């Protein structure tokens, strides 16, 4: 059975007049599942080059079909990442401001029209199904965790008029315990506060990096007015109090202005509040259900600092965070859920990688692309790519590294990465100036040989693999000065372990770098500038290489 999961908006890239605001329909993606197994998955932004694309992911759908060698007629079910009721409500809301829109205001009718228009064939409307948003998040985590049983927490801004749920996963089933209304949205809570720091939607991860520079105690009493912890894992948010309480105390930062001590303290207090609320919920349901494993998904689960605190807390034996925890991951969850309902269950083996996107092609295909850029670039084949790249990095070079299929989700995990020596602290500012043009406080992540991670980082007992760069952990005290480029101001790093079995070419590069430089770690950041999404194709990589200050491009 072929099932196609879909997230994103209900309009094409050229249909701007009726666009639903991106905050409602972001991170468009398509995921193709065959008999419970992921065949292909890609975010629309990688193909249309629009960050957090809210368009109907027609290019992603085309990619998935092409990769499988399938036709649209071969898809048994199209699984959309929200309920039909919610989608219809968004269309009706849009109609209030755009009465010239044609009727009927039916999400299924719109989706059917988009698919039939693009692929020029009739599609049975019964093949289009809608999935509860947070259940899609939850399934995306539990179904791929490898756990037989687990507590599951899905939390985000909002979707389907809710902001999260708690469930218990047991073997092939997922049983909901409680849902959180929009009034308890931790995503909205975070967003409402960061506007005082000069940030908005999709900037939440930046504040996570700013928080260690501040003192949470400065505003702790103020934040106590914004939320309260209740018995049995419940909590209340008082979002209406945020602006009146902070406006007299905080000067709202404008874009380009420096961060004041107030802004840093506010970020620290916000991060502390989020962690307190989530741990309060988890402590209760850990005790009430007896579940010893935890799965996390939803946009809030991309808060890697929070994830690290959960891992260190010892509440759970094992913690799995869906690497595509944002709404693109709902395309994955929706497809998995619908496949399961039709008797096709994923393997209970834990997820080891998310290299499900575009392949860069054969050596001949790569050479053909590079030949098209002659006059702007020169290139040659290397007899030992890993060794030569490692030697260049050890000598101070910053390289673009592109290989294999692209990653699904927001992290570059060794297939679409910018890499450098993790030792000189000056490399942080150098790469920011060269490529990223981003805030200087934001840390870079390390990729480390899986078998040596414990030499450099404080890895909780029982944890051996951290393949998705989604936990912030402590750098060992004696290694912090050595790893100056990847150690944050609070002595932490967002750790990515690399397995020889899962990504042999990247592992070989890090091993070669260890032989050159004495450390089995490299600095790894996503291969993009501060405007575009992560590169997907060789063509994308060449363009980014030419428009930044990278020293070398390795393909």
Spans of model-derived segments:
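Flexible beta->alpha loop and helix N-cap segments adjacent to enzyme active/binding sites
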Residues: 2, 9-13, 17-40, 47-51, ...
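N-terminal phosphate-binding loop and adjacent alpha-helix
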Residues: 46-70, 278
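Short HxH-centered metal-ligating active-site micro-motif
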Residues: 56-67, 78-82, 509, 513, ...
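Phosphate/pyrophosphate-binding loops at sites that engage ATP/ADP/AMP, CoA/4′-phosphopantetheine
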Residues: 62-76, 118-122, 281-290
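Short beta-strand-loop/turn "lid" adjacent to the catalytic site in phosphate-handling enzymes
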Residues: 70-112, 139-140
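Short glycine-rich phosphate-binding loop at a beta-alpha junction
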Residues: 72-83, 128-129, 290-299, 400
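Short acidic-aromatic active-site loops that bind/stabilize oxyanions
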Residues: 104-105, 128-131, 256, 260-276, ...
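Phosphate/ATP-binding catalytic cores across multiple sugar-kinase/actin-like superfamilies
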Residues: 268-294
């Amino acid at each position: 059975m072929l099932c196609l999961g879909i997230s994103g908006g209900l309009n094409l890239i050229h249909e701007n007049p009726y666009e639903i605001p991106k905050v409602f329909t972001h991170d468009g993606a398509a995921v193709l599942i065959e008999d419970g197994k992921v065949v292909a998955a890609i975010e629309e932004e990688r193909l249309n080059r629009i960050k957090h694309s809210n368009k109907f992911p027609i290019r992603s759908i085309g990619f998935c079909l092409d990769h499988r060698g399938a036709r649209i007629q071969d898809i048994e079910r199209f699984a959309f990442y929200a309920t039909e009721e919610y989608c219809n409500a968004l269309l009706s809301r849009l109609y209030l401001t755009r009465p010239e829109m044609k009727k009927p205001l039916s999400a299924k009718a719109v989706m059917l029209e988009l698919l039939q228009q693009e692929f020029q064939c009739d599609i049975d409307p019964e093949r289009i199904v809608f999935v509860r948003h947070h259940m899609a998040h939850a399934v995306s985590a539990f179904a791929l965790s490898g756990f037989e049983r687990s507590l599951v927490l899905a939390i985000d801004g909002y979707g389907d008029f809710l902001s999260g749920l708690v469930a218990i996963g047991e073997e092939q089933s997922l049983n909901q315990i409680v849902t959180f209304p929009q009034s308890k949205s931790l995503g909205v809570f975070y967003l409402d506060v960061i506007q005082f720091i000069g940030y908005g939607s999709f900037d939440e991860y930046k504040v996570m990096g700013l928080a260690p520079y501040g003192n949470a105690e400065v505003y702790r009493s103020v934040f106590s007015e914004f939320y309260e912890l209740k018995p049995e894992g419940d909590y209340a948010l008082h979002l209406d109090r945020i602006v009146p309480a902070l406006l007299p105390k905080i000067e709202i930062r404008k874009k380009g202005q420096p961060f004041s001590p107030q802004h840093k303290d506010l970020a620290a207090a916000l991060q502390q509040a989020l962690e307190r609320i989530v741990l309060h919920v988890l402590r209760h349901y850990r005790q009430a259900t007896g579940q010893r494993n935890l799965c996390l998904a939803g946009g809030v689960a991309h808060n890697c600092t929070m994830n690290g605190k959960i891992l260190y807390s010892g509440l759970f034996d094992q913690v799995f965070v869906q690497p595509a925890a944002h709404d693109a991951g709902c395309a994955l969850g929706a497809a998995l859920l619908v496949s399961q309902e039709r008797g096709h269950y994923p393997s209970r083996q834990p997820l080891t990688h998310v290299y499900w996107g575009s392949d860069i092609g054969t050596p001949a295909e790569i050479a053909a692309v590079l030949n098209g850029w002659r006059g702007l670039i020169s290139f040659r084949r290397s007899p030992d790519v890993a060794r030569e790249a490692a030697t260049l990095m050890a000598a101070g070079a910053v390289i673009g590294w592109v290989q294999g299929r692209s990653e699904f989700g927001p992290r570059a995990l060794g297939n679409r990465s910018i890499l450098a020596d993790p030792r000189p602290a000056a490399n942080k500012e150098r790469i920011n100036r060269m490529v990223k043009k981003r805030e200087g406080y934001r840390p870079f992540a390390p990729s480390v040989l899986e078998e040596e991670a414990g030499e450099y980082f404080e890895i909780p007992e029982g944890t051996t693999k951290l393949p998705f760069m989604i936990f912030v952990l402590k750098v060992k005290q004696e290694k912090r000065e050595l790893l100056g480029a990847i150690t944050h101001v609070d002595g932490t790093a967002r750790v990515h372990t690399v397995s020889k079995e899962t990504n042999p070419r990247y592992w070989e590069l890090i091993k070669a770098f260890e032989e050159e430089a004495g450390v089995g770690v490299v600095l790894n950041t996503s291969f993009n500038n501060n405007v575009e999404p992560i590169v997907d194709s060789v063509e994308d990589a060449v363009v980014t290489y030419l428009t930044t200050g990278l020293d070398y491009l390795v393909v």
